[in-house]
Amino acid sequence: MAEADPKMVTEPAAQGVAEEAMASSACDSGDESDSNSSSSTTSCGSTGSSSSSSSSSSSSSSSSSGSSGSSSNGSHLHQKKRVPGPSRRAQRRPSGKLFMDKLPQAVRNRVQALRNIQNECDKVDTLFLRAIHDLERKYAELNKPLYDKRFQIINAEYEPTEEECEWNSEEEFSGDEEMQDDTPNEMPPLEGEEEEEIGKENTEVKEEVKDVPEEVPEAKVEEEEAPKETSEVKTEEKEIPKEGPEEKAEEQESSKEFPEVKVEEKTDSTDCIDIAPEEKEDLKDVTQANAEYTDQPTEDSTPRAPVREAQKRVPETRPEERVNIKRARKGKPKKEDPPRGIPDYWLTVLKNVDKLGPMIQKCDEPILKFLSDVSLKFSNPGQPISYTFEFHFLPNPYFRNELLMKTYIIRSKPDHYDPFFAWGWEIEECKGCKIDWRRGKDVTVTTRSRPAITGEIEVQPRVVPNASFFNFFSPPEIPLIGKLEPKEDAILDEDFEIGQILHDNVILKSIYYFTGEINDPYYHDFRDYGNRKYYK
């Protein structure tokens, strides 16, 4: 048997490997390989007896073996009707494998050693991410009383005091001013001057000590003068009782004056008796004047008539005025009660978030007015890393749920086929919840009825999905095998980004979204969502 040409053997084998690689991307390549293989086998069967055709028979056998494998793969893919592509979980072959095949074996061994070292580094990264998650959970407990107070103020359960309402910006900078006031104004003394000043201070202290005994005799003299003053006080006390008889004499003189006062009172009473007859005469004159006034008609009597008529007209106008007053009171708007808490707080916050604002439709706003709080909870130690957003709603006429949840699961294990695992947080999966809508209140769907060919309207209208913020709680599921549709993939990517924004900024700094400060151009340029994948 003649030896086979190595070129003729390797070329069909290479074609078979290439056909196997192309079979995963298209079914047509498999069909073409089937046709080529069948033609090659028929040609080989027709030429069979000559010794010179041994090389061609060996080459046809090798090509038939390669084509048989490709035909089997092609038929299997054609039956499945869907080519399994790379997904978020599917392991994909790295493009650097072809480069590794070109390297010498010794270099490949060393590169594999570096890969093993990198795997150990990825394990350290997982510990680092878990430690960050534990720190977040720890400090979330410290923030919990602050979040509770925020909830009470928003929902009018607590009214802040005047001190809590004051802006403490001046206190923040008071520390610098105090530090400046404490600084000495004079220059510190030099080394030689310090010794001279210390000597001067010692001499001054000695002089003060010498002056102290000279002051002691002066104190003794003052003590001797003190008993003299006490003796003088005693002599003054003795002189006080001598004044007693003089006071008694003055009292007797005052008693002698009282009879004169009584005499004056008696004279006044007699004068009153003498004046009484004159008063009687005056009274008689007054009565006569009144009689003459009544008999003679006066000119003042004529203008008094219209005054009396005006008095009669007053009660006629009063009922009309009262009616007008009542009408005016009805027309006036009633005084509105002052707002309680902070109305529409979370609705305003979510509308100012970049990715969530466009999702909120007009039909969503009346529902989101019942949103009382948004909180963040972290997974317990020992569980897979995840965090859950809790949306608390007040009782409302739209759905029966008081709590809507959205959970994001973080990838915490290294992926050998992802060289950028150490870049930070990456959301692996998200889960929503089911909303128990009341009848006719579901804003996530709408009904449409189209006329049939006959012109009649459909009895059962179609249910069509509707754009709404509450689609946020029903994200598309990630398949274990295969890949998502492009539209679903885009929705999921945006959902992951929203979860990152809520986690990093919205829950912690919601007040800046409410006031709109977060949309200021100064802050917009330096925004970072915490994940380099979504860095802007």
UniProtKB/Swiss-Prot annotation:
Localization, UniProt: Nucleus
UniProt cross-references to InterPro entries, sorted A to Z: NAP-like_sf (IPR037231), NAP_family (IPR002164)
GO biological process: nucleosome assembly
Keywords for this protein: Nucleus
Annotated stretches, region: Disordered: 1-104, 160-338
Ranges of biased composition (kind: Basic residues): 77-95
Compositionally biased residues, Acidic residues: 160-184
Compositional bias (Polar residues): 287-300
Primary residence: nucleus
GO CC terms of this entry: chromatin; nucleus
Family named by the database record: Belongs to the nucleosome assembly protein (NAP) family.
Name of the protein this chain belongs to: Nucleosome assembly protein 1-like 3
UniProt source species: Rattus norvegicus
Gene: Nap1l3
